[in-house]
């Protein structure tokens, strides 16, 4: 079965709950193609890609959403980004010798910390931090929303190295249902039904089939899907700006240490940018050695 990478929003007409579903295949494959990840790492990275895409779909902003997990375990870093125009990228760092074939999130990232950052082009940056607790990433994110002053939100995530899928339910401010007990009963009803969805079903079924399987007795409005794509924002210009920010003296020292050229590798896509002495001289031509430029990078 062929699936296009997409996020798709839906609403329940009789209650104040919205949902989002995400399906990643090609973009997930492109992320994995950049690095030879062990299967458990690839699965967790896929779940994070799906989670970031789901969260981005719930926000109205122009900018970047970043999910980053750090730990002292076999996977010290997981990082994914999803932009407001639905471009995704991600990476993981790991120690292969200490990863079991069936390792879960807690085995891979013990004592971990998850950071959620929303970085708008205009406006104030938001950052939330939570311990990486729970059986899996979906539980960790659900607990974060439950413990913070956010709209109640639940996640269901799964990935298998080929396809990454996610389902999100979020309770909206009171509109259709004003009574607190009725709102809570409706929320519990919808999330309990979603809890019956198996990982195999989430990975194998399309959005309409999943929603019919769970909510055939509810009135659900499904919106047009929005495409998601892999895209890395690295460029030679950004790499050059990074060198300028170091200052001319440090760049000249690096040229000496690296035998005449400076290499900058993108950790997300493995693209390599080389700068020789002539390139570096051109970067600082007319600028003296005043240090960082005002160019944002």
From Swiss-Prot:
GO terms for MF? protein folding chaperone; unfolded protein binding
The protein's organism comes out as Pseudomonas aeruginosa (strain UCBPP-PA14)
RNA-binding recorded as keyword: no
For this protein, the record's Gene3D superfamilies field holds: helix hairpin bin, Hsp33 domain, HSP33 redox switch-like
Q: How does it get modified post-translation?
A: Under oxidizing conditions two disulfide bonds are formed involving the reactive cysteines. Under reducing conditions zinc is bound to the reactive cysteines and the protein is inactive.
Q: List the disulfide bonds.
A: 232-234, 266-269
Could you list this entry's UniProt keywords, alphabetically sorted. Answer: Chaperone, Cytoplasm, Disulfide bond, Redox-active center, Zinc
Its name, as the record gives it, is: 33 kDa chaperonin
Similarity comment: Belongs to the HSP33 family.
* The keyword Ribonucleoprotein is assigned to this record: no
BP GO terms, sorted: protein refolding
- Which PANTHER family does the UniProt record give? 33 KDA CHAPERONIN
Looking up HAMAP family in the UniProt record yields: HslO
């Amino acid at each position: 079965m062929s699936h296009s990478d997409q996020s798709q929003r839906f609403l329940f007409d009789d209650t104040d709950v919205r949902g989002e579903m995400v399906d990643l295949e090609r973009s997930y494959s492109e992320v994995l193609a950049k690095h030879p990840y062990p299967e458990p790492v690839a699965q967790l990275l896929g779940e994070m890609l799906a989670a970031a895409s789901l969260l981005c779909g719930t926000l109205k902003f122009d900018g970047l959403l970043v999910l980053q997990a750090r730990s002292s375990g076999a996977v010290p870093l997981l990082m994914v980004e999803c932009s407001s125009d639905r471009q995704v990228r991600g990476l993981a760092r790991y120690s292969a010798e200490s990863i079991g074939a069936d390792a879960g999130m807690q085995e891979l990232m013990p004592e971990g910390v998850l950071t959620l950052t929303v970085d708008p082009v205009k406006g104030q940056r938001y950052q939330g931090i939570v311990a990486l607790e729970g059986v899996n990433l979906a539980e960790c994110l659900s607990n974060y929303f439950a413990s913070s002053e956010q709209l109640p939100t639940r996640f269901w995530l799964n990935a298998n190295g080929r396809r990454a899928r996610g389902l999100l339910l979020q309770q909206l401010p009171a509109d259709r249902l004003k009574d607190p007990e009725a709102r809570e009963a409706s929320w519990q009803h919808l999330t309990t039904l979603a809890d019956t969805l198996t990982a195999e079903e989430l990975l194998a079924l399309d959005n309409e089939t999943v929603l019919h399987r769970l909510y055939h007795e509810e009135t659900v409005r499904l919106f047009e899907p929005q495409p998601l794509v892999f895209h890395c924002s690295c460029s030679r210009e950004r790499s050059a700006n990074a060198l300028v920010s170091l200052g001319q003296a440090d760049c000249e020292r690096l040229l000496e240490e690296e035998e005449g050229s400076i290499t900058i590798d993108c950790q997300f896509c493995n693209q390599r940018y080389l700068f020789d002495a002539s390139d570096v001289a051109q970067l600082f031509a007319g600028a003296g050695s005043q240090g960082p430029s005002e160019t944002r990078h």
